């Protein structure tokens, strides 16, 4: 100690304090960099926040946010005639109300009835829609939470799960549950793995392709799970298996892949992902929310479809949406598990609640039994032959669209799509999208790389020639006006959003958009 004091006697106390503080701070940062697996992202956020708080910069940011909000709001229009911002003093007559709602429904229908919408409306046939509506109306008061009062709903639910399970070549131990949609199916699967492996790690991680559905990110944010995104091969756009294997560690509880993925319609190498899961004794989830009702039937029709389901050893769960290509009413999906023990990890039970014994398989307590009935009705009415017929039409239309895209100079298809989703890009792709929108098309804008995709539905069967014709014309219009491309529309928004390095800022603008979306166009008075 005396030697240390002699050595430091010539240093000013203030300098010693500052030096010590600096070394301590540097040590803390170094420790965080080593131990905090998301340190880089957190550091980037702090840097961008510091820049945005600088004088002058914050004003620019506010102005750009305001401009973006104005443009984003143009993307949705609401009829504010006969608006009800407070309860009417007297209830409106049923017949008058229905007439008003019919008029509004007609406006909505005009946006998709011409078959120019990617995904969204998957069938839209009047007779099938009528069946769904009648099935719902018969059980509109029912609730699966009360099985003794509504035993028929249990029949519809368990049989729907069984039909979907069988379609995906499930073995005898596979079980499942009905959910409200793909996001909930994925959420419940992730929750099940977290709880199933809780004795193994208290810092769970999942390893997934960067192209997997954002519902995995949502689930991990809610459930406090670290999500590790793996890049895809720049040619095939399938997940990089070497990188996936490298990312697995002692805290990894799950690997996952898509069949097909939402952005590009690519089927990940599920067999290789499942082998990794077996090797490391972890779960393997296949997200087939989009492809689950097309791929099995396309395979039967001898299209080149790789095996992606429970036939692969190591696949321990799957998600598939009945409300997409299962043609059920919006609000149903199925999550399947390889055994009952894994499914039980999904449940919530509250044995000590004063309100009685409470338990539920998924997130909601009460659920609309009418949707369960409509789901069952859709599956049973379509049957194997019905799904085969629709799958053939969808696959043939997709094949012709791919051929048409390949014939257009300057257009590049992303990867090698095997089913009904085709992503493509070209110069000024978002301006091309704006011109396609003016022709009535509703396509999906993508990023990384900037591109568009079309999800071919049964509603779009036979629309391939018009699609390619309109796309060629839109590309020509962009080329002809390349020196004076419009500053309005969605192209500037998408272009800037995809190129901005500050992703937190993009997230803020998206939150601004949601604010506008769920806020009344007119702020109601508090008086009635």
Swiss-Prot record:
A molecular function GO annotation: pyridoxal phosphate binding
GO biological process entries: actin cytoskeleton organization; ameboidal-type cell migration; carboxylic acid metabolic process; cell motility; chemotaxis; lateral pseudopodium retraction; negative regulation of aggregate size involved in sorocarp development; positive phototaxis
Membrane topology: Single-pass membrane protein
EC number(s) given by UniProt: 4.1.2.27
Keywords: Endoplasmic reticulum, Lipid metabolism, Lyase, Membrane, Pyridoxal phosphate, Signal-anchor, Sphingolipid metabolism, Transmembrane, Transmembrane helix
Disruption phenotype annotation: Cells produce short fruiting bodies with a thick stalk and drastically reduced numbers of spores. Mutant cells grow exponentially at the same rate as wild-type and are 25-fold more resistant to the antitumor agent cisplatin than are wild-type. Mutant cells survive longer in stationary phase than wild-type cells, but are effected at multiple stages of development. Addition of 50 uM extracellular sphingosine-1-phosphate to wild-type cells mimics the developmental effect of the knockout, and leads to increased cisplatin resistance.
Enzyme class at the top of the EC tree: lyase
Cofactor(s) needed: pyridoxal 5'-phosphate
Membrane-spanning parts: 13-35
Function recorded in the entry: Cleaves phosphorylated sphingoid bases (PSBs), such as sphingosine-1-phosphate, into fatty aldehydes and phosphoethanolamine. Sphingosine-1-phosphate (S1P) probably acts intracellularly as a second messenger perhaps by promoting cell proliferation; the absence of S1P lyase increases its concentration. This leads to increased lateral pseudopod formation as well as defects in the efficiency of chemotaxis.
PANTHER family according to UniProt: PTHR42735, SPHINGOSINE-1-PHOSPHATE LYASE 1
This protein's name: Sphingosine-1-phosphate lyase
